A protein has these predicted regions:
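C-terminal His-loop and adjacent cap/lid subdomain of alpha/beta-hydrolase
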Residues: 1-192, 212-433, 437, 490-494
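Low-complexity, polybasic segments enriched for Lys interleaved with small residues
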Residues: 434-481, 485
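Short glycine-enriched nucleophile-adjacent loop
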Residues: 203-214
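Gly/Ala-rich beta-loop-alpha elbow adjacent to hydrolase catalytic centers
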Residues: 197-203
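Hydrophobic alpha-helical segments that drive targeting, anchoring, or assembly
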Residues: 133, 197, 464-465
């Protein structure tokens, strides 16, 4: 008994240590996202009520990756209406649920989010991740006239955040009440199209706001439509709906499909009625994994001719073994390649744009959809490449600082390392070759004669750096903006 107690204590200590390490990684500042966003329409910006340093790794990514008007216009072939709104309250922003809700409501009002065409209440995964493909597809299709609001409840992967779902549901329910209360005070014609989004654990923590209730309750909360990707098997609302869809959704507005092709094949009347989409791949283990498969054969391992597509007919259920193997599948299902969209396992990127258009009633032309799909892939690949390059540069800088310390260089080492590293990188891969191309002017005849006769021609060369000086002074202009949160902030547009 003593040995078991010691073993149990050791395992618990190891788990807690692992949790702390993962949380530290979730709060870490990535080199690619060290600087706060400059758009006043996103959290963490100089005009935001939310400090950038409290957003966590996923929050900093989410706010920094918002599209600009120019990016939207270039893809859609028509001028963007406005800059998109992205609001994120981190787990470290404030410790109390009530304070987080108040803070994000203040941000919604500050940015005039309730005046946008579409307002999205999104529930993140355990780590705080909001699907970038979803967010960008929405911003393209609305021409920027949209807002996405979300609150973090954990910095751990979804598999390690299962004990925090109660907090997440409570937090989401509190924000839902706050948003619907605000919408209730608006005239019907002035309200935005209020929609929901959740992926993986985010789908569970959003749907279970209405646990033991019905789709009609969602309608009473002004919810226009929703998209849920890879809904976990433990989701109470989804389980109740699957068992008795006629009671939970008498109007048939909720559908569960594997891919968008199944939506296209629907009866026209059924497709027209659909507003709430549960997208669950047949080979995604997230909607299948649960303690219920430990001792009981799951429905998806029934007779071979009744199994969903892509579930091997040769696979048999074994007590305990099936549970372990399905758990292993959880890891493999989330293995994705940036820029290469798939439609397998827990990767839903392939169909997201079309589901956004269909569920949220945001029609686009076939040409625009093609351009959106291409842009989504290109952007995801670019962001991934930028992160890799930034991390490599950061590691090189750290190595250089250590070497300089060994040389006895301590004062101003950081600045020296930055300068030296920039010089080395500039020689290897000049980012701005324009000044180098102008160098041949020195070899022109103007160099030989006028250089000696008239010093006036050398003076422009001395003044040339002055053209770059505003760029160096630019941060000084931004400094006052960071001091604004000390007092009441005006609404954007006032």
């Amino acid at each position: 008994a003593i040995s078991l107690a010691i073993l149990g204590g050791g395992l618990l200590a190891a788990y807690e240590y692992a949790v702390r390490r993962v949380e530290q990684g979730g709060a870490a500042v990535e080199p690619a996202y060290e600087s706060p966003p400059q758009s006043q329409f996103v959290s963490g910006s100089p005009g935001s009520l939310i400090p950038f340093e409290t957003l966590s790794r996923e929050g900093r990514r989410f706010t920094n990756m918002a599209l600009t008007r120019d990016e939207i216009s270039n893809v859609m072939g028509t001028p963007a209406t406005c800059d998109p709104i992205r609001l994120f309250v981190g787990l470290d922003t404030t410790p109390e649920v009530e304070d987080r809700v108040d803070l994000i409501m203040d941000e919604l009002i500050r940015t005039r989010a309730f005046e946008r065409e579409v307002l999205v209440f999104a529930s993140p995964t355990g780590s705080g991740y909001i699907n970038y493909v979803f967010a960008e597809a929405l911003e393209y299709m609305t021409l920027g006239d949209c807002a996405i609001a979300t609150m973090q409840y954990s910095m751990l992967p979804s598999s390690m955040s299962l004990t925090r779902t109660g907090l997440a549901i409570e937090q989401n329910r509190a924000l839902m009440h706050a948003i619907t209360g605000y919408l209730r005070g608006m005239a019907a014609q002035d309200r935005p199209k209020f929609v929901l989004f959740g992926e993986s654990l985010g789908a569970l923590t959003m749907q279970d706001i209405w646990r033991h209730r019905t789709v009609e309750a969602m309608d009473r909360d002004f919810v226009h439509s929703s998209i849920f990707l890879g809904t976990p098997s433990a989701t109470e609302f989804a389980k109740a709906w699957r068992l008795d869809p006629g009671r939970i959704d008498p109007d048939g507005t909720m559908l569960e499909v594997d891919n968008f092709g199944e939506v296209v094949d629907l009866d026209p009347a059924q497709r027209a009625a659909a507003r709430h989409y549960l997208i669950s791949h047949y080979d995604d283990p997230i909607p299948k994994f649960g303690t219920n498969i430990l001792l009981r054969r799951p429905w998806w391992l029934g007779p071979g001719d009744e199994r969903p597509a892509r579930v091997p007919k040769s696979t048999t259920w074994r007590p305990g073994t099936t549970f372990v193997l399905t758990g292993v599948d959880l890891i493999n299902a989330m293995d994705v390649v940036p820029g290469r969209f798939g439609r397998r396992g827990h990767d839903y990127r392939e169909d997201i744009a079309r589901f956004v258009s269909a569920a949220y009633d945001l029609p686009v032309t076939a040409e625009q959809m093609l351009r959106i799909e291409r842009a989504l892939r290109a952007r995801e690949l670019k962001w991934a490449q930028d992160r890799v390059v930034s991390e490599q540069v950061a590691r090189a800088k750290e190595a250089l600082l250590r070497e300089m310390k060994n040389w006895g260089v301590s004062s101003g080492a950081g600045g020296s390392a930055d300068s030296l590293l920039s010089s080395l990188l500039g020689e290897a891969m000049p980012a701005e070759p324009a000044p180098v191309k102008k160098a041949p002017v020195k070899t022109s005849p103007a160099k030989k004669a006028p250089a000696k006769k008239s010093p006036a021609k050398t003076s422009p060369a001395k003044k040339a750096p002055a053209k770059e000086s505003p760029a160096k002074k630019a941060p000084a202009k931004k400094a006052p903006a960071k001091k604004k949160p000390a007092g009441p902030l005006p609404l954007i547009g006032e």
